[in-house]
């Protein structure tokens, strides 16, 4: 037998040994995940923008300036009017990157953000995959590139932003609340060490929100939500963490802390004009509608209070019905709406919003299929085939909107170009992401019993236990 034939047969035998025991569907799933990663990359190329770690250059330049003995909030990035705007604790946390080149700091942030996104999606998608009988690795493998293609995530990567790291801190508390509700410390952790029992018991819930608030003030709205829903221990942990970190920062960097809280915090013009297209908050919408660089103050305050009441009220109802994920999502989206500045890369809570809508569609369809077999039950002709269709369509539409991100083709800047230069359609597109999150705050559905976060018995938790037992 020729040597070439023998070599080919040896290679085939090696492949068979390696692939023996691997299910063919596993190979198919790996191929699908690879295809989705490639499609996500093409989407980023098609709809993303040129990224050069613009924000990371500001952070890096500011901490290098500070480490050289200068005042942190005196730094201005060359060729811009922008400086460091975060609380001083964020400056301390970023200080180690002063020893790195800016490109290295940017790529480390990208890798850390991807890891944070993967961990969060594992926690959020895992229960859905388990209920539907999908391999968790496959579901997460699809979710990560799909999320990476959206406007908030790709902008966070490209600008060197910290949004996904803060997102992970906040969602860690939601997972801790999940563990508290399940009481895992009472059964599955017996025999483990005290550190493991403490961690998986969820007793530290609130620390993530407290740390996030110390780095950026907008997560403080989650503390308000915790107080509103009477989750006292978690709220106290969050407040204690934020105060403890802030006081410790005063000890280490007293001058910068005093200047930030007495001066820099109130200088809203440090981050840019309200009407800038990437500002997809309510304030940005109103400024653009008025074709002004400034937001009409009283009108913004009135509508902000209304959206705050709607968002927190709906979040509290979602919590009471046992859906903590939707409650957290509503609070995050409400913070985006009412903040004076919410750049498009801040809108990361649209990711769990898509998941909530998709899961609501799956749950409704599953329930309809179960009911369709009940004898004597009269149902509409569309039942169950189209049940959950509107939630699925909303999930797909929301996802496509945040992948395509139609704000950029209609970007305008005063006084050179009016925000009405492209007519009504252009104005709608320029405000489309903001309008979407406002609509989500008002209409995002919750799923009773899906994510309970109670310390004792409650109707929602009792319902969930019965459903899981069945």
Residues covered by each model-derived region:
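Primarily membrane-embedded glycan-assembly and transfer machineries that use lipid-linked glycans
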Residues: 2-203, 232-347, 419-427, 446-470
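Aromatic-enriched
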Residues: 45, 358-362, 376-470
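Hydrophobic transmembrane alpha-helices
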Residues: 101, 116, 216-219, 353
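Loop-to-helix entry and N-terminal half of a specific, functionally important transmembrane alpha helix
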Residues: 136-146, 324-332, 369, 373-376, ...
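The feature captures the transmembrane alpha-helix scaffold of multi-pass secondary transporters
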Residues: 203-207, 396
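Transmembrane helices and adjacent periplasmic/lumenal helix-loop junctions
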Residues: 209-226, 338-349
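Perimembrane helix-loop-helix junctions
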Residues: 221-243, 360-364
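Hydrophobic/aromatic-rich transmembrane helices and adjacent perimembrane loops
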Residues: 344-359, 433
């Amino acid at each position: 037998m020729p040597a070439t034939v023998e070599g080919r047969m040896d290679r085939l035998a090696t492949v068979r040994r390696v692939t023996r025991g691997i299910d063919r569907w596993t190979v198919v799933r790996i191929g699908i995940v690879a295809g989705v990663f490639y499609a996500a990359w093409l989407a980023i190329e098609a709809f993303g923008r040129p990224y050069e770690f613009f924000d990371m250059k500001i952070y890096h330049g500011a901490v290098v300036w500070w480490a050289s003995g200068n005042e942190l909030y005196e730094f201005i990035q060359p060729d811009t009017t922008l400086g460091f705007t975060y609380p001083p604790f964020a400056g301390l946390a970023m200080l180690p990157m002063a020893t790195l080149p800016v490109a290295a700091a940017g790529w480390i942030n990208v890798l850390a953000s991807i890891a944070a996104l993967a961990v969060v999606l594992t926690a959020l998608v895992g229960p859905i995959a388990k209920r539907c009988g999908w391999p968790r690795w496959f579901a997460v493998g699809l979710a990560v590139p799909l999320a990476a293609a959206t406007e908030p995530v790709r902008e966070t990567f490209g600008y060197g932003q910290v949004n996904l790291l803060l997102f992970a801190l906040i969602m860690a508390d939601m997972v801790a609340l999940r563990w508290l509700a399940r009481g895992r410390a009472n059964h599955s952790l017996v025999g483990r060490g005290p550190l493991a029992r403490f961690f998986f018991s969820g007793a530290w819930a609130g620390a993530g929100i407290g740390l996030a608030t110390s780095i950026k003030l907008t997560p403080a709205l989650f503390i308000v939500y915790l107080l509103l829903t009477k989750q006292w221990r978690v709220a106290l942990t969050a407040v204690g963490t934020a105060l403890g970190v802030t006081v410790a920062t005063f000890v280490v960097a007293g001058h910068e802390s005093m200047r930030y809280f007495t001066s820099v915090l109130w200088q809203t013009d440090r981050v840019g004009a309200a009407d800038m297209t990437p500002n997809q908050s309510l304030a940005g919408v109103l400024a653009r509608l008025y074709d002004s660089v400034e937001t009409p103050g009283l009108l913004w305050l009135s509508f902000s209070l209304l959206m705050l009441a709607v968002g927190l009220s709906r979040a509290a109802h979602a919590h009471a019905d046992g859906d903590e994920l939707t409650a957290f999502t509503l609070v995050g989206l409400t913070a985006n709406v009412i903040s004076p500045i919410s750049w498009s890369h801040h809108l990361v809570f649209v990711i769990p919003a898509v998941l909530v809508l998709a899961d609501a569609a799956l749950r409704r369809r599953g329930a309809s299929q179960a009911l369709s077999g009940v004898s004597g039950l009269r149902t509409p002709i569309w039942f169950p085939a189209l049940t959950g269709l509107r939630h699925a369509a909303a999930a797909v539409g929301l996802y496509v909107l945040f992948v395509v991100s139609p704000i950029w083709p209609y970007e305008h800047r005063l006084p050179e170009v009016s925000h009405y230069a492209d007519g009504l359609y252009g104005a709608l597109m320029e405000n489309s992401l903001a309008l979407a999150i406002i609509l989500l705050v008002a209409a995002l559905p919750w799923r009773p019993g899906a994510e309970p976060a109670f310390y004792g018995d409650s109707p929602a938790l009792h319902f969930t236990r019965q459903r899981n037992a069945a």
